[in-house]
Regions:
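Switch/communication elements of ASCE P-loop NTPase nucleotide-binding domains
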Residues: 1-54, 276, 305-451, 457-460
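Short, well-ordered strand-loop elements centered on a beta-strand within folded domains, enriched
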Residues: 3-4, 93-122, 140-142, 301-316, ...
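A structural detector for beta-sheet-dominated domains
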Residues: 9, 22, 85-87, 98-100, ...
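Hydrophobic, Leu/Ile/Phe/Ala-enriched alpha-helical segments that form helix-helix packing faces
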Residues: 44, 48-51, 86, 99-101, ...
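Electropositive, glycine-dotted interaction segments
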Residues: 100-286
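C-terminal intrinsically disordered extensions
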Residues: 120-142, 439-462
Length: 462
């Protein structure tokens, strides 16, 4: 599984920008502040949220997320659009999501489209399923694959008759779920599952669409995101999310500090946390001069429903007392979080990890080493943003994406021309910033004399 490209329209400060991910397993996004690096992470995270299958989203969920989602729409625009191209097994999917604000200033899904093609050369996209919606429609329109492209049929009433009505699911229920930021394909999969479970007949075309939709939903489930918000919460000793992928389950568990009232875990969660620590400890001591992670547990309550535990994760150095990880440096906390997530892409070809500002709190030499190891051994895909340029010396040209402003538009570029294996890409990038030596990379222009004169003026006025 691999993300191939991403197009963002009216997303924050991006009017219409496309980024291709050429790297086999790693793509690092570099560039000046405000040039659309974090937007890439946020857009894919928004798609993950929209296509989420872990839990149904309701009005309470939307209340907490509404303002955040609305802030992603470019100022002065009525809608945003995200178009993601992702390769899954022998197929490539083109996934499109357009959302905007209705007259009540609420979020509204205007379009949800899925196209599919084979990974074979010369194959072309064909529609799998597409939802079209606006405030004037009594119900959304649904389009499926048509051999004759000139004939476009709305299949919503047919799907309602064949599937929704068979499950006694009303039109109002479907619209409510859509309004609460649930994807149509997740609703479709859920309704088809009920039909199959009850041994009712269903058309083959629906089963084929359902199979592909499940593949897409699982792929988004397998995308993990470490955002700046999560990193900040761990720094504030509020919660530290760790990723897990073991035989029985996969996902994320929030680790709270010892005195947090939410530091309460059942037996299954405790076993998962211990397993994560066991896996991380295979690499952690090798990168921290022998320090290992330990998990201390304490029984909180015993009831008929089971035992609840409070836990404390500690760091134990050779010949030293173990200390709470929250009393360690933010770098040690970040390394633990990062390694728990990296385990997935090291072991699984269907795992994707996105990390915003991966270099924050990580020693630059260690980070460069980790990225070099990952580029050689990662089975999954890593997409990250960063400012520290040292890793550029360890990555190949197809793993380095450079952002800049060109003609007032954010662009995502790669190094052009012939580049020998001995070329230092970090120095090449710095040269482009100083001398404008790369015609496709806009340098960060700093008016140095103006900066110095302004500083002198500021000092005079004190």
């Amino acid at each position: 599984m691999r993300i191939r490209s991403l197009r963002l329209i009216n997303f924050k400060n991006l009017e219409d920008s496309t980024i291709e991910f050429k790297g086999k397993n790693i793509s690092g996004i570099y560039g000046p502040n405000g040039t659309g690096k974090t937007s890439v992470i946020e857009a894919i995270d928004l798609l993950k949220l929209y296509f989420e299958i872990e839990r149904p989203k309701n009005k309470n969920f939307l209340e907490t997320e509404r303002e955040k989602i609305k802030s992603l729409i470019s100022k002065g625009k009525e809608s945003l659009k995200i178009i993601l191209e992702i390769e899954i097994k022998e197929n490539i999917y083109l996934i499109e999501l357009e959302l905007g604000l209705n007259k009540f200033n609420d979020i509204m899904i205007l379009k949800e489209g899925i196209q599919i093609k084979s990974t074979k050369s010369r194959s072309v996209y064909k529609r799998l399923i597409e939802l079209e919606n606006n405030i004037s429609l009594p119900q959304p329109k649904i389009y499926l694959y048509e051999k004759n492209k000139k004939e476009i049929q709305d299949y919503f009433l047919e799907i309602q008759k064949d599937i929704f009505n068979e499950n006694n699911t009303s039109l109002q229920e479907i619209i409510l779920k859509l309004n609460n930021f649930n994807s149509f394909i997740s609703i479709f999969v859920s309704e088809v599952k009920k039909i199959v479970k009850n041994n009712k007949q269903i058309k083959d075309k629906y089963l084929e669409i359902n199979k592909r939709c499940i593949e897409i939903l699982i792929s988004f489930y397998n995308i993990n995101v470490i955002s700046l918000k999560e990193q900040a919460l761990s720094n504030l000793e509020i919660v530290m999310p760790i990723n897990f992928n073991i035989e029985i389950a996969q996902g994320t568990i929030p680790i709270c500090c010892k005195n947090n009232p939410r530091n309460s875990y059942g037996e299954e969660e405790l076993n998962i946390i211990k397993k994560v620590i066991e896996n991380v400890n295979k690499l952690f001591p090798l990168l921290t001069q022998g320090a290992i992670l330990e998990c201390e547990e304490e029984i909180l309550t015993k009831t008929e429903e089971g035992v609840k535990y409070s836990i404390k994760i500690t760091v134990k150095r050779p010949n030293k007392e173990a200390i709470d990880i929250y009393h360690e440096s933010t770098g040690m906390i970040k390394l633990f979080m990062l390694l728990s997530a990296l385990m997935n892409i090291l072991q699984r070809t269907d795992a994707i990890l996105l990390v915003d500002e991966i270099d924050v709190h990580i020693f630059e030499y260690l980070l460069a080493y980790l990225l070099e190891i990952l580029s050689n051994h990662s089975r999954g895909q890593l997409i990250f943003t960063a400012h520290n340029l040292l890793p550029l010396e360890k990555l190949n040209r197809d793993s380095i994406i450079l952002t800049s402003f060109k003609d007032d538009k954010v662009t995502y570029e790669y190094f052009k021309g012939k580049i020998s294996s001995s070329t230092n890409l970090r120095l090449k990038y710095l040269k482009a910033q100083y001398l404008w030596s790369e015609d496709n990379i806009q340098p960060l222009v700093i008016k140095e004399s103006k900066v110095e004169s302004t500083i002198r003026e500021l000092q005079k006025n004190v």
